[in-house]
Amino acid sequence: MTATIKLGELAEFLGATLRGSPEKEITGLATLQEAGPAQLSFLANPQYRKYLVDSQAAAVLLKAADAEGFAGDALVVADPYLAYARVSHLFDPKPKAAAGVHPSAVIADDAQVDPAASIGAFAVVESGARIAAGVTVGAHCFIGARCEIGADGWLAPRVTLYHDVRIGERVVIQSGAVIGGEGFGFANAKGIWNKIAQVGGVLIGDDVEIGVNTAVDRGALADTVIGNGVKLDNQIQIAHNVQIGDHTAMAACVGISGSTKIGKHCMLAGGVGLVGHIDICDNVFITGMTMVTHSITEPGAYSSGTAMQPAAEWRKSAARLRQLDDMARRLKQLEKRVGDVTPGGNASSEG
């Protein structure tokens, strides 16, 4: 169902300065290039300013500087991208689940499901689980024993929570995510791997989002902990006993080994890997495909590996890398020979 909201109502909702008719009706959102005469757009990135003049949008979210000289209707705000984020929820077409339990769902007798929660078809809620008001549990979800889901959470179809997972309020978990699976713990005795029972749980804070097919393993002893406001993209692996600080965000395919601690307000780009038992301080940005092998104690941006280059150049560089040891030995020999004939005997490349 398409929402229709007047421009004046949007201005009031955002606390924006309205330039244009408050009665103009907005039915959706679109980019500057694609917006039609009933859609709202926004300009947040300067590289798209070239599309502003010819945009057919009904109105545009703009900073004050960009609004100068713009002839169309506008909502003037300090941060157009943040304003767009807030408005997007007003036009979200995602179906709203009705409260109640689907007849095909299986609910343990001692599970507590608030009447204002929604439990979808073929969902399973095991013994001792507690589901708060406003929670949506999608079709075919599994909620293990003694799990807790705080108010207004949303679980897409086919989410799995193993036993003893505690989730805060307003948490979003996408399809295929598995929370509380057994951590990868084994003791080796004479070449034979002996399984270690993973007796901890998972603790997830408020306002967390977890993407499609992401795995958060339960702790070996203490809980694996995901802080408030953490955002995890698709296909991320969080190993046992990992701790992630508040408002840290990770892009797809990040892998974090066991017992690593990540601070608050960090950003990990796609494909980052971290070894186990290290600490990452607050306010760290790690670029894509970086391999983190030791603790980071200072805020800032960190990278590893080589940047993209034409394949022929990369092959030459790779060949030279294999020769580095030999080149270092030859350089040392040359330094020694030059040092033998240099006054003072100092021919080091460091001198």
UniProtKB/Swiss-Prot annotation:
Report the Pfam families cross-referenced here. Answer: Hexapep, LpxD
Q: Which SUPFAM superfamilies does its entry note?
A: Trimeric LpxA-like enzymes
| GO biological process, alphabetically ordered | lipid A biosynthetic process
Q: Which InterPro entries match?
A: Hexapep, Hexapep_transf_CS, LpxD, Trimer_LpxA-like_sf, UDP_GlcNAc_AcTrfase_non-rep
Q: Which GO terms describe its molecular function?
A: N-acyltransferase activity
Q: Name one GO cellular component term.
A: membrane
Q: Which Gene3D superfamilies match?
A: 1.20.5.170, Hexapeptide repeat proteins, MurE/MurF, N-terminal domain
Q: What is its EC number?
A: 2.3.1.191
Q: Which domain of life is it from?
A: Bacteria
Q: What class of enzyme is it?
A: transferase
Q: Where is the active site?
A: 240 (proton acceptor)
The record's similarity note reads: Belongs to the transferase hexapeptide repeat family. LpxD subfamily.
- PANTHER family attached here? UDP-3-O-ACYLGLUCOSAMINE N-ACYLTRANSFERASE, UDP-3-O-ACYLGLUCOSAMINE N-ACYLTRANSFERASE 1, MITOCHONDRIAL-RELATED
Give the protein's biological function: Catalyzes the N-acylation of UDP-3-O-acylglucosamine using 3-hydroxyacyl-ACP as the acyl donor. Is involved in the biosynthesis of lipid A, a phosphorylated glycolipid that anchors the lipopolysaccharide to the outer membrane of the cell.
Q: How does the annotation summarize its subunit structure?
A: Homotrimer.
The record's section on HAMAP family has: LpxD
The protein, known as: UDP-3-O-acylglucosamine N-acyltransferase
Record the organism.
Answer: Pseudomonas fluorescens (strain SBW25)
